[in-house]
UniProtKB/Swiss-Prot annotation:
Compartment(s) of residence: Cell membrane
Name this protein carries in UniProt: Uncharacterized protein YrjE
One annotated Gene Ontology cellular component of this protein: plasma membrane
Major location category of this protein: membrane
Length: 234
């Protein structure tokens, strides 16, 4: 009985360490993105304005790059490649560059409210996802598929620029990524148990990337909602 308790404690400590590593990587990614956005807005505002005036199609092309980077990064992470970590940081930096242009369209109040709300929701949903006894696999897979529908809707709205559709997309986006935050946290435990605690750094980077994307997208959808409520819209 005592031996079983020791094994359970060791497994629990290992899982906690795995979660800590993932959260640290995810937090580092968010910090890098925030820092790059701040640098862009603080020191390159004139350059950003010139780029904005070059046309919105330019940004449509730019937003395709992160999609390619995510696929490549996940592949490297699963292979436990040493390049996975620097590419993850580079990806976060590039996202910070892109997000900085979005932030220009909103007030500091909108940005702060969106970030604080996203952080609070992320914390609550992470706790729920980690400790709930309910199996969230079906929900997670359904929302994972729904993300592609969301991307298509956003692409179409890029041309129609409908405020009503923007609100609908943003509300649906918040719901989808709320579910994914809970699911991805539960999946961390599943991955750890499936590998009998022998999880590589690649797994940590892969899971950190998922949580990073969940948080960033939650923040951006909330920002659109707060912006529209405050009289700003992109």
């Amino acid at each position: 009985m005592n031996d079983n308790n020791v094994i359970f404690d060791q497994r629990s400590d290992g899982l906690n360490a795995f979660f800590s590593k993932i959260y640290a990587l995810m937090g580092a990614g968010v910090l890098v993105s925030a820092l790059v956005s701040w640098i862009m807005i603080t020191f390159f505002l004139d350059n950003m304005t010139a780029i904005l005036q070059s046309g919105s199609l330019f940004f449509l092309v730019l937003w395709i790059i992160p999609l390619v980077m995510v696929v490549s990064l996940q592949g490297l992470a699963m292979k436990n490649s040493k390049m996975a970590l620097p590419i993850f940081i580079g990806y976060a930096a590039f996202m910070g560059f892109l997000i900085s242009f979005t932030l220009l369209m909103y007030t500091a109040t909108d940005i702060t409210l969106a970030f604080v709300t996203a952080a609070a929701m992320f914390f609550g949903l992470s706790v729920y996802g980690r400790f709930t006894k309910r199996n969230l696999s079906a929900m997670g897979k359904a929302f994972g598929v729904a993300v592609w529908g969301l991307i298509i809707a956003m692409f179409l709205n890029f041309f129609f620029a409908s405020t009503g559709l923007t609100i609908l997309i943003s509300l649906v986006g918040v719901v989808i990524f709320a579910g994914l935050i809970a699911w991805d946290n539960q999946k961390i435990t599943q991955v750890y148990n499936a590998n009998n605690g022998q999880v590589s750094d690649g797994w940590a980077i892969s899971m950190a990337l998922s949580l990073y994307l969940d948080f960033i997208n939650m923040f951006l959808f909330l920002l659109r909602l707060f912006g529209i409520a405050g009289g700003n819209r992109d």
